[in-house]
Amino acid sequence: MEVNILAFIATALFILVPTAFLLIIYVKTESQNKKN
């Protein structure tokens, strides 16, 4: 089975970018909640 590298990279970015974005928001809100 041949895998298109560009398609694999695009899929990885499509999954990782929103996940990292949500994690950053989550960490920021958690740190703010701990300070308050």
UniProtKB/Swiss-Prot annotation:
Gene: psbM
Subcellular location: Plastid, Chloroplast thylakoid membrane
Protein name: Photosystem II reaction center protein M
Residues passing through the membrane, by range: 5-25
Pfam families for the chain: PsbM
Organism: Panax ginseng (Korean ginseng)
Main location: plastid
Superkingdom classification of source: Eukaryota
Function: One of the components of the core complex of photosystem II (PSII). PSII is a light-driven water:plastoquinone oxidoreductase that uses light energy to abstract electrons from H(2)O, generating O(2) and a proton gradient subsequently used for ATP formation. It consists of a core antenna complex that captures photons, and an electron transfer chain that converts photonic excitation into a charge separation. This subunit is found at the monomer-monomer interface.
